[in-house]
């Protein structure tokens, strides 16, 4: 069922930060989620068996937008004697606040033997590039003036999105809400970590 592949919570007090239910214009018994994480799958030939994990919330450890692609391990590794020391191969796409791309790989050390070490190939926009780059809404406003709808959401896309979200919301209304809560300034509740650990995976926190 859908609700077994998602976690929804409310942040609580930490230090001087108010918990959500003590914020202005928020009901004391509010069950409005401030955090959600989930596991998504796509049932087609291209993405069959590939899990997509998503996570978003208020008052988390950092305000970032990031995509991490973890490549599958090969059945037979050339460095089989030291494969337990190999790091995961990752493609990290940083969207906000700092745009950039990095590729995390394992490379053979420049010594005798087959020992490896992690290496990182990175690209990040320079300060000058950032100064000369228009903001996202500038492009959209300019497109609007030109009558170009390429970068705007189409109604059919929006309709499909709500169809997907409504299906999850309907499942949650069928079971009694459970709000284990999480501390503000963290990456969410334990239940979010368990969602991945059941598959032998984990969130890639603090990676760039």
Language-model segments: which ranges?
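Histidine- and/or cysteine-centered catalytic micro-motif in compact active-site loops
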Residues: 43-45, 55-59, 70-74, 96, ...
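Flexible, glycine/threonine-enriched loop-and-boundary segments that flank and lead into catalytic domains
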Residues: 17-28, 51-54
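A short catalytic or substrate-binding loop motif that flags glycine-/basic-rich loops and adjacent residues
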Residues: 19, 29-34, 45-48, 59-63, ...
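Conserved nucleotide-binding/hydrolysis modules and their immediate coupling elements
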Residues: 78
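Single conserved hydrophobic/aromatic residue that forms the stacking wall/gate
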Residues: 1-7, 11
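C-terminal helical cap and adjacent loop that interface with cofactors, partners, or active-site loops
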Residues: 37, 62-64, 69, 86-201
